[in-house]
């Protein structure tokens, strides 16, 4: 279960990075307004 926790933390970290890079891109931000507040 520890391995699963680490994998989940890594995934959420990668998702957060992807969302940040998306929200700093005007086209991606416009396509995903629900992710970018």
UniProtKB/Swiss-Prot annotation:
This is Alpha-conotoxin-like Lp1.9. The keyword Disulfide bond applies. It comes from Conus leopardus. Keywords: Acetylcholine receptor inhibiting toxin, Disulfide bond, Ion channel impairing toxin, Neurotoxin, Postsynaptic neurotoxin, Secreted, Toxin. One of its GO terms (cellular component) is extracellular region. Pfam families: Toxin_8. It is found in: Secreted. InterPro entries: Conotoxin_a-typ. Its main location: secreted. One of its GO terms (molecular function) is ion channel regulator activity.
């Amino acid at each position: 279960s520890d391995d699963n926790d680490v994998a989940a933390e890594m995934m959420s970290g990668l998702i957060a990075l992807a969302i940040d890079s998306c929200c700093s891109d005007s086209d991606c931000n416009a396509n995903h307004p629900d992710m970018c507040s």
